[in-house]
Each structure stands twice: as structure tokens, then as C-alpha cells.
Amino acid sequence: WPNKIEPGK
């Protein structure tokens, strides 16, 4: 899912 640590994952 998209998150703030690794966007795009």
C-alpha cells in the first residue's frame, strides 16, 4: 500500500 516512508510501494 502507498505510505509516507516509501511512496509507490
Curated annotation (Swiss-Prot):
Keywords: Cytolysis, Secreted
GO process terms (BP): killing of cells of another organism
Cellular component annotations (GO), alphabetically ordered: extracellular region
Superkingdom, natural source: Eukaryota
Coiled coil regions, renumbered to chain: none
Disulfide bonds: none
Record's subcellular location: Secreted
Transmembrane segments: none
Organs and tissues of expression: Expressed by the venom gland.
Chain's role: Presents weak hemolytic activity at physiological concentrations (micromolar range). Does not induce mast cell degranulation, weak lactate dehydrogenase (LDH) release from mast cells and antimicrobial effects. In vivo, injection into mice induces increase in nociceptive sensibility, but causes very reduced or no edema formation. It also causes no alteration in rearing (standing on hind limbs) and does not impact locomotion.
Identification of the protein by name: Cryptide Pep-6
